[in-house]
C-alpha cells in the first residue's frame, strides 16, 4: 500500500494524502476523515 493507493481509494490527490499524513492544517475535516478511514482500514 502506497500513498498513491490511499489517494486512489479515498478519491483525493496524493498531495492531500501527504498533507494529512504530515498533519498539515490546510486540509478540510471531511477530507481528513475520509483519508484517515482508508489509512486505518489498510493499516498504513
PLM regions and their residue ranges:
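N-terminal helix-turn-helix DNA-binding module of bacterial transcription factors
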Residues: 1-44
